[in-house]
C-alpha cells in the first residue's frame, strides 16, 4: 500500500494543551508527531550534566566486522550494528547513571498517557525497551532508513493497517536538531507500508527532518522508517531516545544490575519501567512473576512516593 503525505504539514506539531485524542490520531495517521516543550530547559541541563562524563568516555560505533557490501555479503545479524555510525555514540545505562532520568523521564505523565492509549486496550501494561543518549559528531554520515520493530521477528507477521503497534519511541532533543547537524529524518506514513512497497534505505524524497529545539521531542512508532541525518555542521547533535513496548516483549536493555537502593529511590511506575515489578496483560493476567507472587512483594521492595 502506498500512502501519500503532504510534507509541508507533517509531522504535526503539538504541545501539552493539545487534546490527547488529536495527538493519538496524528501518530496513527502519520506515524509521528513533534511535541514542543516535552521537557523544560532546566531538566535538560541537569540530564546533560549527569550524562556528560559517560558520553565523553564512551566509544564510537560501529562494532562490526568488515564485509563486501557491494557483493551483498553482510549477514543479517551484522546489519543491526551498522545503525551505529562511526562518529556516533550510543550511551546506555541511563537508569543507573542519571537521577533525572529515573525521576523526571521515567515518570513523565504525558509520555505515559500516550503509552496507555497505544497499548492499554491491546496489550495491558508496558515497560521500557531501552533508553540511550544518541550523540552525533560533526562529519557523521546519514544513517540508513530502518524500522525499529525489525528487532521483533513477529513484526513480519503484521498484515493489516489496524494491527496493534509493538513499539513507540520518544526522541528528546538535548541540543538543537537542525537539518545541517543530523536531525532525525522521518518518512511519514511509512508505518503503513506493506510488503508490496519496496523499502527505502537512502536518499528518500519522502523523508522530512524533525527540527527540534532543546526539550522538544519527536514521538514515532517503531514501524516508521527513519534514520539519523548527516551532520554537516561543526557542532555535535545530541538526543535521548526512550523506547517503550508491551510487557509481552523482552526489552533490549536489562536492569537486573541496578542496585536495590537505587531502585527503591524510584516510584512504582518507574520501577515497573525497568522490570522490577510484576505487570498485567490486557486480560489482567500477571506477567513477570516470582512464582505465584509479585516480584515487588517477594523482594520486599520499597519505593519512593508518587512523583
Curated annotation (Swiss-Prot):
Keyword flag Oxidoreductase: yes
Class of enzymatic activity (EC top level): oxidoreductase
Binding-site positions, Fe cation: 146, 148, 226
Protein's GO biological process: terpenoid biosynthetic process
Applied use: Compounds in the chrodrimanin family such as chrodrimanin A or verruculide A exhibit strong inhibitory activities against protein tyrosine phosphatase 1B (PTP1B) and therefore, they could potentially be developed into drugs for the treatment of type 2 diabetes or obesity. Furthermore, chrodrimanin B, the end product of the pathway involving chrodrimanin A or verruculide A, does not exhibit the PTP1B inhibitory activity, while it functions as a potent blocker of insect GABA-gated chloride channels.
GO MF term list: dioxygenase activity; metal ion binding
Cofactor: Fe cation
Family membership noted in the UniProt record: Belongs to the PhyH family.
Name of the protein in question: Dioxygenase cdmD
Organism: Talaromyces verruculosus
Amino acid at each position: 500500500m502506498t500512502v501519500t503525505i503532504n510534507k509541508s504539514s507533517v509531522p504535526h506539531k503539538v504541545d501539552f494543551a493539545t487534546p490527547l485524542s488529536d495527538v493519538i490520531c496524528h501518530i496513527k495517521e502519520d506515524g509521528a508527531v513533534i511535541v514542543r516543550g516535552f521537557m523544560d530547559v532546566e531538566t535538560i541541563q541537569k540530564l546533560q550534566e549527569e550524562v556528560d562524563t559517560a558520553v565523553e568516555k564512551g566509544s564510537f560505533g560501529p562494532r562490526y566486522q568488515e564485509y563486501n557490501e557491494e557483493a551483498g555479503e553482510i549477514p543479517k545479524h551484522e546489519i543491526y550494528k551498522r545503525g551505529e555510525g562511526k562518529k556516533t555514540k550510543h550511551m546506555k545505562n541511563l537508569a543507573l547513571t542519571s537521577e533525572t532520568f529515573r525521576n523526571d523521564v521515567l515518570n513523565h505523565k504525558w509520555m505515559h498517557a500516550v503509552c496507555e492509549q497505544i497499548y492499554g486496550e491491546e496489550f495491558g501494561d508496558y515497560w521500557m525497551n531501552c533508553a540511550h543518549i544518541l550523540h552525533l559528531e560533526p562529519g557523521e554520515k546519514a544513517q540508513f532508513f530502518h524500522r525499529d520493530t525489525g528487532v521483533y521477528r513477529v513484526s513480519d507477521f503484521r498484515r493489516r493497517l489496524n494491527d496493534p503497534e509493538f513499539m513507540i519511541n520518544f526522541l528528546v532533543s538535548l541540543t538543537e536538531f537542525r537539518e545541517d547537524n543530523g536531525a532525525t529524518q522521518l518518512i511519514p506514513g511509512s508505518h503503513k507500508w506493506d510488503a508490496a512497497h519496496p523499502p527505502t534505505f537512502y536518499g528518500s524524497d519522502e523523508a522530512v527532518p524533525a527540527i527540534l529545539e532543546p526539550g522538544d521531542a519527536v514521538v514515532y512508532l517503531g514501524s516508521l522508517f527513519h534514520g539519523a541525518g548527516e551532520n554537516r555542521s561543526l557542532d555535535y547533535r545530541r538526543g535521548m531516545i526512550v523506547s517503550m513496548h508491551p510487557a509481552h516483549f523482552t526489552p533490549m536493555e536489562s536492569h537486573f544490575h541496578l542496585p536495590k537502593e537505587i531502585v527503591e529511590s524510584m516510584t512504582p511506575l518507574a520501577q515497573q519501567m525497568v522490570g522490577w515489578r510484576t505487570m498485567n496483560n490486557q486480560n489482567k493476567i500477571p506477567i513477570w512473576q516470582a512464582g505465584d507472587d509479585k516480584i515487588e512483594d517477594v523482594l520486599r521492595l520499597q519505593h519512593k512516593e508518587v512523583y
